């Protein structure tokens, strides 16, 4: 199938393609989650969730593999790194808990509501879940092995945040020789609106391809349907 994309169309074989859902957790998209508590605007997250659901429904119907990234750490935050790690200094979740000690153990800790995937996008049978502890879903995970074992070469990225974990993962995919596509209306940024456009520009010009949910769903719906 040929996907209309920028800067040029890209051909994707469904059996060699996966949709990668980046960090669609309560932490990043729900009122009362870490991102909301840290002061970021999450008002666009509801629309993002709806567009991701549309994407996943179409992908599963066509037999395209769905892979979830889930970001966070153990309840004691050992995996987050201590003061010797730049993550300790830059993670807004960790900084928020240091400012508000009453939140300690609640933000991005495995097993908590904050860490959980949002109700609307719960993984389905056959989907793959890849836990991660840093922005990129390729760092210290089995993601590369998961993809190579299945002959997957093309990755369609959706999720939050466009300019952090989505872009970090797509860049690493590029460096590992994967073809990365970002569905711009199925991602949401953290920060001013121009941040979204900056990532779109980076992906389009340097690291991959940019497309829309409607274009992806329109093309993938023409693939042979999955039969039992």
From Swiss-Prot:
Keywords on record: Hydrolase
Alphabetical list of InterPro entries matching this protein: Isochorismatase-like_dom, Isochorismatase-like_hydrls, Isochorismatase-like_sf, RutB
Gene3D superfamilies assigned to the protein according to its UniProt record, in alphabetical order: Isochorismatase-like
Pfam families: Isochorismatase (PF00857)
Biological process terms in GO annotation: nitrogen utilization; uracil catabolic process
Enzyme's top EC category: hydrolase
Keyword ATP-binding found: no
E.C. numbers: 3.5.1.110
Keyword S-adenosyl-L-methionine in annotation: no
UniProt-recorded Gene Ontology molecular function terms: hydrolase activity, acting on carbon-nitrogen (but not peptide) bonds, in linear amides
Catalyzed reactions: (Z)-3-ureidoacrylate + H2O + H(+) = (Z)-3-aminoacrylate + NH4(+) + CO2; (Z)-3-ureidoacrylate + H2O = (Z)-3-aminoacrylate + carbamate + H(+); (Z)-2-methylureidoacrylate + H2O + H(+) = (Z)-2-methylaminoacrylate + NH4(+) + CO2
Catalytic-site annotation from UniProt: 23 (proton acceptor), 132, 165 (nucleophile)
Name under which the protein is recorded: Ureidoacrylate amidohydrolase RutB
Biological role: Hydrolyzes ureidoacrylate to form aminoacrylate and carbamate. The carbamate hydrolyzes spontaneously, thereby releasing one of the nitrogen atoms of the pyrimidine ring as ammonia and one of its carbon atoms as CO2.
Family as reported in the entry's similarity comment: Belongs to the isochorismatase family. RutB subfamily.
Record-linked PANTHER family: ISOCHORISMATASE-LIKE DOMAIN-CONTAINING PROTEIN, PEROXYUREIDOACRYLATE/UREIDOACRYLATE AMIDOHYDROLASE-RELATED
Gene field: rutB
């Amino acid at each position: 199938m040929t996907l209309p994309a920028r800067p040029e169309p890209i051909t994707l074989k469904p059996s060699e393609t996966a949709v990668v859902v980046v960090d669609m957790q309560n932490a990043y998209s729900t009122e009362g989650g870490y991102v909301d508590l840290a002061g970021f605007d999450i008002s666009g997250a509801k629309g993002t969730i709806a567009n991701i659901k549309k994407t996943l429904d179409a992908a599963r119907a066509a037999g395209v593999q769905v892979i979830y990234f889930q970001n966070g750490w153990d309840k004691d935050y050992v995996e987050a790194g201590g003061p010797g790690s730049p993550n300790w200094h830059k993670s807004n979740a960790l900084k928020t808990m240091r400012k508000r000690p009453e939140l300690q153990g609640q933000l991005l800790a495995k097993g908590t509501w904050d860490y959980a995937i949002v109700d609307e996008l719960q993984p389905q049978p056959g989907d793959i879940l890849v836990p991660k502890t840093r922005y990129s879903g390729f760092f210290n995970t089995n993601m590369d092995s998961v993809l190579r074992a299945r002959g997957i070469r093309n990755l369609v990225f959706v999720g939050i945040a466009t300019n952090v974990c989505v872009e970090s993962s797509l860049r690493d995919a590029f460096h590992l020789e994967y073809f990365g596509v970002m569905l711009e209306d199925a991602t949401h940024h953290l920060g001013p609106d121009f941040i979204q456009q900056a990532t779109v520009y980076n992906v389009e010009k340097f690291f991959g391809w940019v497309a829309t949910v409607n274009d992806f769903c329109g093309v993938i719906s023409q693939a042979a349907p999955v039969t039992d």
